[in-house]
Amino acid sequence: MKIGVIKLEKLVLIDGNSIMNRAFYGIMGSKMLTTKDGKYTNAVYGFLAILFKILEDIEPQYIAVAFDLKGKLKRKELYEGYKANRHGMPEELAEQMPIIKEVLKAMNIDIIEKEGYEGDDILGTLAKYGEKQGLEVTILSGDRDAFQLASDNITIRIPRTKAGKTETEDFNRAKVLEEYGLEPAQLIEVKALQGDTSDNIPGVPGVGPKTAISLIQRYHSVKELYEKIDSGEDDLKGKQKEN
């Protein structure tokens, strides 16, 4: 009697804003793609190229795309300075978003948006829910912050556009462990120490990415690190200890 391999149904979740931005800047070059009447299309072209590739590669039973909505973010209620350094979306990109959404609707792909939340917040919730339902989940995002969601059944796929061609790299729990020497959830602790200039999140002065990773590898969490400092059991020196 042969025992067959049970294949899990697949769920693909796409960070719409992240992939749209990556497509826009990846194909911008010296002259952006336009239609005959001058409408910009480089983000549309790049987004759809990435979408079609993941559909071909994974053949998911379920798929959804999450986008950010304008308005006050819940994260700003926790920290007012969140993304305060960000400029608005370029007009050349903004005018392509409705076209991308129109194509997604024509393809019968769900678009998910929620006031107060960013697309990656939505994806995180859906990914964990899908995993609990026994699905094999792939998150398509250009944001490595998504690595904190990686598990045995949740894979983060990072696209790269080179010379108009899309390449991807997958990160599951094993890949994150190999790359960082940490569990995916511990990357949150790393971010707390190093901060994130792109999101205007301050970190600990004098602590960069390599130091932050090393500290969490050694002390496992920010809480445990500070407990060791308070008790004098740490081996930090100079500015690391002062801050």
Label the model's feature ranges.
Residues 7, 59-64, 109, 132, ...:
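Non-catalytic nucleic-acid-binding/docking modules located in mid-to-C-terminal regions
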Residues 6-140, 144-170:
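Noncatalytic, basic helical substrate-engagement surface that gates or grips nucleic-acid strands
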